[in-house]
């Protein structure tokens, strides 16, 4: 006898349909799984065998062949356990074959209960696009899968395979899970407040500019000056995630297996802070099963690299593609996968190995050559992709004990949202497809958007000649100046905006001492 069910697999960031075929024929009792399965899929036969018996069903003592189509695409993970069990039941006559517009996902425990699987959202989105009307998933994955529900598809949660069988037989229907209304407003409540940061007015201003324009930041200062404090508070003044960004971010976290059980969409902008010992593979992603790395897990959020020169050169060079293209491609012998990596980079470093070069009260123990060698670990091409560089001085005693409250994240966020609203209106016009903030402007778009006053143009010309700026540095300064002008509500770039942008140049601050 023969039966076929619909399921789904993962390829990169997207799902793809898989037909689970079961054929029971005469011969010696045996189970064969074909269709390019990995070891986890091959082991599913033992799980299905035990689950069937523990649920009170009969295991066919005949030759069973399972085919996972298409056969030329590798199938990974335990997601096919549930459809495999149902296919065996249908092929052995213990269950009527389910309709073709039903699909099934889920890992089996030996007692027949269902365990959550990774990558449910991209598979559910593919199911909805492919005309599936009923998707059965483990109960812990239901909230995530329900975010793919449209006017046609319903998501049905099940704690055990027995519940699915009873629902298909019409004995005990399962109530569908409804999607939770998307509300990212409360995400800010879980981020530390900028009011906790004492002093550092220049660095605080740089973080506002970075948030308003989507710019990358480098913080340089001695230990204890507040570099990490500022970085961890940046997500609290960024605009809320749009639903499109939330879906993309949730897909990444779901594939990586980092979605909390029972959670729907990710509503907070990610903040990732890998240790400086992280390898290039940890940042880029990959592995035998193609999992997203830190660059992709920070998508639509902040990637914070503390102690930047301590990262290996190989790891830092991984950042160049995502910073330039907004995505990262991982290639292995088994194939390649491309993941979105549109993150905002915040890097922090000490001015030297001991950390106290230029400190007003503590002596530096590094020689000039040691300082030069330490700073040279950060390559020029990487510095060329950082828009804002801030040198942070030690916090004075009076700043720690002032009675004047510092601006809170809520106050700074109002400035950022106002500037982002200006940019949203500007880039809604034709010719700015894919541009959401000033940092994403191409060289040609910079010329159109960054119109200057005559005095500002003379200042930029003089700076270009005097400082020996490159074309990329020229455009970077204009992007930052455009953000400064947006924060001030100005149409044209004036001298004040350009001077503020010029003071944040990263290349010279790191390479000179």
Where do the protein language model's features map onto the residues?
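Walker A/P-loop
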Residues: 219-260
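Peripheral, non-AAA+ core regions of ATP-driven protein-machinery
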Residues: 1-218, 222, 228, 331, ...
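Conserved alpha-helical scaffold flanking the Walker A/P-loop in AAA+ ATPase domains
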Residues: 208, 265, 270, 280-303, ...
